[in-house]
Each structure stands twice: as structure tokens, then as C-alpha cells.
Regions:
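Hydrophobic transmembrane alpha-helices of multi-pass small-molecule transporters
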Residues: 64, 179-183, 209-213, 291, ...
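Transmembrane helical elements of multi-pass membrane transporters/channels
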Residues: 20-39, 141, 152, 175, ...
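Short alpha-helical transmembrane segments in multi-pass integral membrane proteins
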Residues: 1-22, 80-147, 189-244, 307-373, ...
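Short runs within selected transmembrane alpha-helices of multi-pass transporters and secretion channels
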Residues: 73, 142-160, 168-179, 197-210, ...
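N-terminal transmembrane alpha-helices
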Residues: 9-46, 60-75, 79, 104-111, ...
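Small-residue-rich hydrophobic transmembrane alpha-helices
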Residues: 52-112, 149-168, 279-345, 378-399
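Helix-terminus/linker motif at the lipid-water interface of multi-pass membrane proteins
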Residues: 34-52, 122-129, 185-192, 254-284, ...
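Small-residue hotspots at the loop-to-helix junctions and early N-terminal turns
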Residues: 47-60, 135, 139, 198, ...
Length: 452
């Protein structure tokens, strides 16, 4: 952004400004969520529910890589926006350059660890005897693409902070379209099974990352030189804490999913559904939930540059206006999503293949119980991100850690002891209710501070 374009963040009507930035961000993240949905749909019809169960085992490992990427990208995005608000262009350039370097290094390290410890990792995340071969095959090819994936996901929010949310959206969209085209070809024409689904996903990630590289060569406000790509401790310390909430949100989700998968296998094995049906079904339900959360995060993260600029420029009344407009929109999203989950669960699960009556029975129960507190979940997630945008990583990360680790993990372990397999399903709404109380208190305190 140039100075005049930056000024728009501090003067334009909030409603229009929020839509302008949030819509492309939302579409970008929604497209990212569709990567997994598309894989699940084609694998469900081409391989069967064991194939879907295998991808559900691998999914948390992709989320872990995403967590590292968004810690770098979202942190840099928040910091760059604040720097623009303060007129500190040099620090903004150095933050972006170091984020590029760090994302590449992190991606390579994660891929190496995944490759070396593949078998124990899959066992840790709930692979069963029936789906292990599928999981190993899928994970092998996903691992190859991890460095590209981390880089592409880290660059996307940085592109938004440079005033190009539309390009950020298009780069994600291009990768998703490629994935959608290649998936059926790889699975149904070439008969590559889960390997084909993984290869199509990686191909889409390559396209997204390549577009990110092209953008870095033609940035708007950022002027990157070779010196900016050095890793400087002072710059890293300035922006990585701002992305800590995003990282903890993802890493906490990974921990929760690992615990959930293992509880599903343990208590499912003693139920009429067996171990593999609950593991597969809840994984699919979580992918659908990720669509809702992607919209939630997109609406909130799209506002980060606006909040960051106005907070840096000390226009606190505008920050407060964004706060309550955002929370209202997120609550409405949650209500609409809840109605869909309650009214059309069978139609939703049918998208992922034709399975037995027992499978469908558990799917309907899971949609209706596990996601029954969606309006609270969307507001909670928005609260985490808003505090991050204000440059308050402690409150942001604290709420996220409280929800995903201190609540979700103990609940998913303890509730099944009293309610069996259903206890696993009760754990999510219970965690959302308690977190909503904490989020409300934090937001009210932020509102009071913004009034001063």
C-alpha cells in the first residue's frame, strides 16, 4: 500500500472496508478448506470409507504444518499492518523477507521429521489395522508437498497485508481448481486411489506457492531487497508472538484431534459401530466444520489489517466499531450453519459416498450433537483473532490454549468414561459453552479499553 491507500483504512466506512478485506480472505481460506473436502468426496466414492478414515488420520498432521505457516504469515501480517499505521516501512519489509525465509526452512524440517517418523506418527493419530496401509500411502505423498504448502500458506496473509486481498484469494482459488480437476482424473481414470488424491492436492499447492513467488517479485507497498530475507532476532521476536494465537489454535486442534481419534477408536471398538465408522464419520464432520471455521477465520483475519492500522494510528473508536460488527456477523454465521447441520445431516454425509445404514445413523447423530453449539464456536474463534489484531498475543493465545487444550482434551478423555462413545461427541459443545464465557469477559474488557 502507498500512503494514500493506507489512509483509506483509517477513513473509509467500516462496513464497506470490512467486506472489501474480509471477502477475499474468506474465499481464500474457504478454498483451502475445500482441498480436504474434495479429497474426501472423491476418496469416499472411489476408495470407500476406509480411505476416508486414512485421510482423517493424516489431517491433523497437515493442520500442524498449517499452524506453523499461519504463525509466520499471520504474525507478519499483523506486524506489517501495525508498521504501516506507524509509517515504519523498513521494519515491514524486513518482517516479510524473514517470513519468506523462515517458512521455507520450517517446511523442510517438518517434511524431514514426517518422513523419518512416519509409522509411529500415524499410530499416534489413531490409524487402525484396517486403514493403516491407506494412511501410509496418503501421508507419504502429502509429506513431499509440505515445504511448498507451508510457504504458500505463510505468504497468503502477507499478500493481504500488502493491500492485495484479491490476489491472495486468486492464488488459493487457482490451486483449489487444479485440485478439483486432478482429483477425479487421478482416482477414477488413473486408478491411483489415495495416492492420486494426495498428488492432486500437492499439485494445487504448487500452483498457489508459485503465484506467491510471482507476487513477491511485484509487490505494491513492500520493497524487498536481498538484505530483507535475513533472519533477524529482533524482527522475529516482534512478529512471531502476534501469530502465536494462530499457531496455538492449530497445534491445540492437532492435540485435540489426536486425543479424539484415539478415544473414537477405543470406545468405538466396544460399540455397535466398531472403531472405523466413528473415526471416519467424525473426521468428515470435522472437515465440514472446517468450512464454517474457515469462513469465521476469513471474516476475522480479513479485518486484521484494518484493526492493526487503526490501532497503530490510535483510532480506537474504529477498532471498537469493527469489534461489534464482527461479532454480530460471526454469531449470525453460526446460527445459519447450525440450522443446516440440524436439518440436513444425512444429505451432508451422503456427499462422501454411499455407506451402510449403521454408518449413516452415527453420522446423523454426530452432526446434530457434536456441532450443536456452532454459534458459540464462531464467536469464540473471532474473539481469539480480534485480540491478535489488537497486538495482544497473550490474551489471544491464552483463550485459544484454554479452549483447545485445557478444556477439549480433558473433556474428550473424561466424558467417555461416563457416557461411552457419546461422551466424545459431548466434549465439543461442552468446551464451546465454557469458552464462550471466557471470551465474553475478554471482549468486554477490550471494549472498555477501546472506549478510553
Amino acid at each position: 500500500m502507498e500512503e494514500k491507500q493506507n489512509a483509506v483504512l483509517g477513513t473509509a466506512p467500516l462496513g464497506k472496508l470490512m467486506v472489501k478485506f474480509a471477502l477475499p480472505c474468506t474465499i481464500s481460506l474457504l478454498v483451502g478448506a475445500l482441498y480436504n473436502i474434495v479429497d474426501q468426496i472423491f476418496i469416499g466414492w472411489g476408495v470407500g470409507y476406509l480411505g476416508n478414515g486414512a485421510t482423517n488420520v493424516v489431517f491433523p498432521l497437515t493442520v500442524l504444518a498449517l499452524g506453523l505457516a499461519v504463525m509466520i504469515g499471520d504474525g507478519a501480517c499483523s506486524y506489517v499492518s501495525i508498521c504501516f499505521g506507524k509509517g515504519q516501512a523498513e521494519n515491514a519489509n524486513r518482517a516479510v523477507g524473514s517470513a519468506v525465509t523462515l517458512s521455507v526452512l520450517v517446511g523442510v524440517v517438518v517434511a524431514a521429521l514426517y518422513g523419518v517418523f512416519q509409522t509411529p506418527i500415524l499410530g499416534m493419530f489413531g490409524a487402525t489395522e484396517a486403514n493403516f496401509a491407506y494412511a501410509k500411502e496418503y501421508f507419504t505423498y502429502i509429506t513431499i508437498g509440505i515445504p511448498i504448502y507451508v510457504f504458500g500458506q505463510a505468504i497468503n496473509p502477507i499478500i493481504r497485508s500488502d493491500g492485495s486481498p484479491q490476489f491472495a484469494m486468486l492464488s488459493m482459488l487457482a490451486g483449489a481448481i487444479a485440485n478439483c480437476i486432478l482429483d477425479p482424473i487421478a482416482i477414477f481414470v488413473l486408478h491411483w486411489g489415495v495416492m492420486g488424491a494426495a498428488a492432486a492436492t500437492v499439485a494445487g499447492q504448487v500452483i498457489t506457492a508459485a503465484m506467491g513467488v510471482c507476487y513477491l517479485c511485484h509487490t505494491r507497498a513492500l520493497r524487498l531487497g536481498k538484505d530483507d530475507f535475513k533472519l533477524r532476532g529482533k524482527i522475529l521476536a516482534a512478529y512471531l508472538p502476534l501469530g502465536l494465537c494462530s499457531f496455538l489454535a492449530q497445534i491445540s486442534l492437532v492435540i485435540a484431534m489426536a486425543a479424539t481419534n484415539n478415544m473414537l477408536v477405543q470406545y468405538g471398538a466396544g460399540s455397535k459401530y466398531g472403531a472405523d465408522i466413528p473415526l471416519t464419520v467424525l473426521g468428515i464432520v470435522m472437515k465440514v466444520f472446517q468450512i464454517i471455521i474457515s469462513i469465521t477465520i476469513g471474516m476475522s483475519a480479513g479485518c486484521i489489517p484494518i484493526v492493526g492500522y487503526n490501532y497503530g494510528a490510535e483510532k480506537l473508536d474504529r477498532c471498537r466499531g469493527i469489534l461489534w460488527r464482527l461479532m454480530g456477523a460471526e454469531a449470525l454465521l453460526g446460527v445459519i450453519a447450525l440450522l443446516i447441520m440440524q436439518l440436513f445431516p444425512l444429505q451432508l454425509i451422503s456427499l462422501f459416498g454411499a455407506e451402510s445404514a449403521l454408518y449413516n445413523e452415527f453420522a446423523v447423530i454426530t452432526f446434530r450433537v457434536y456441532l450443536c453449539m456452532l454459534p458459540l464456536a464462531t464467536v469464540n474463534k473471532a474473539a481469539f483473532i480480534f485480540m491478535q489484531a489488537l497486538g495482544k498475543p497473550a490474551e489471544s493465545a491464552g483463550l485459544s490454549f484454554f479452549r483447545e487444550v485445557l478444556l477439549a482434551v480433558p473433556l474428550v478423555i473424561l466424558l467417555p468414561k461416563a457416557f461411552g462413545l457419546m461422551g466424545v461427541l459431548y466434549s465439543m459443545p461442552a468446551a464451546d459453552i465454557i469458552t464462550f464465557i471466557a471470551s465474553g469477559l475478554v471482549l468486554l474488557r477490550a471494549d472498555r479499553q477501546l472506549r478510553k
